[in-house]
């Protein structure tokens, strides 16, 4: 199929993903702050029992504790281990939770045994917003990002028909060099560059384009189906 507009290709891919099990409600133009709140909401829903969050939502500083743990993970392997680790610990500082205030609790983040079932959530982010690290650069906006239980794990850049897929990958490389994939976005495990007739998959921080199929270790067989 020919797409003369990148936006049409983007909408078509969203439609395919939705048909394959990704949530139909698309998160549009979300910033890192928005995505953190989305993740906090999912963590709350999956951990609201008395032994965990005791039906009291996570505070901003509790989410910051999780971010700080992520920022200590310097390699893709360790970041992948975080995603697959099934749980993360925080010290409760929500004063409303008198049962756990000041105590360490463990939160369920993801269980790959629950793929397409249980408490798993699979969301699409359209045109996510990335703040740049330099005042000399404008903030960036990606094409698509895929979230599993609120965690960004796949980033997709698209080009319309007639534009080489290498240009989409070069865009990802540019974002990487600008430090876009840090903070919450450092959890991204797979980059996907696409034009309507060709797709390139690459693990994070690989500096060359390799057209090799990748089975994502968190349990997805492909980005198109759950």
Map each language-model feature to its residues.
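An alpha-helical interface "stripe"
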Residues: 1-226
């Amino acid at each position: 199929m020919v797409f003369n507009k990148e936006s049409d290709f983007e909408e078509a891919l969203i439609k395919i993903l939705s048909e394959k099990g990704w949530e139909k409600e698309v998160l549009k133009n979300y910033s890192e702050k928005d995505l953190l709140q989305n993740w906090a909401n999912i963590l709350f829903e999956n951990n609201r029992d008395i032994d965990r969050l005791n039906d009291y939502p996570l505070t901003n500083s509790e989410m910051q504790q999780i971010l700080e743990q992520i920022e200590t993970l310097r390699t893709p392997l360790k970041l992948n281990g975080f995603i697959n680790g099934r749980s993360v610990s925080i010290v409760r500082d929500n004063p409303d939770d008198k049962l756990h205030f000041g105590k360490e609790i463990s939160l369920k983040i993801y269980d790959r045994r629950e793929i397409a079932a249980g408490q798993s959530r699979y969301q699409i982010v359209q045109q996510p917003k990335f703040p740049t690290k330099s005042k000399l650069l404008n903030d960036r906006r990606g094409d698509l990002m895929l979230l599993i239980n609120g965690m960004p794990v796949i980033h997709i850049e698209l080009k319309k028909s007639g534009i080489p897929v290498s240009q989409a990958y070069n865009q990802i490389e540019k974002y990487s060099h600008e430090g876009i994939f840090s903070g919450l976005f450092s959890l991204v495990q797979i980059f996907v560059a696409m034009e309507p007739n060709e797709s390139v998959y690459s693990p994070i921080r690989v500096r060359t384009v390799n057209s090799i199929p990748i089975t994502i270790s968190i349990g997805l067989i492909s980005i198109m189906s759950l």
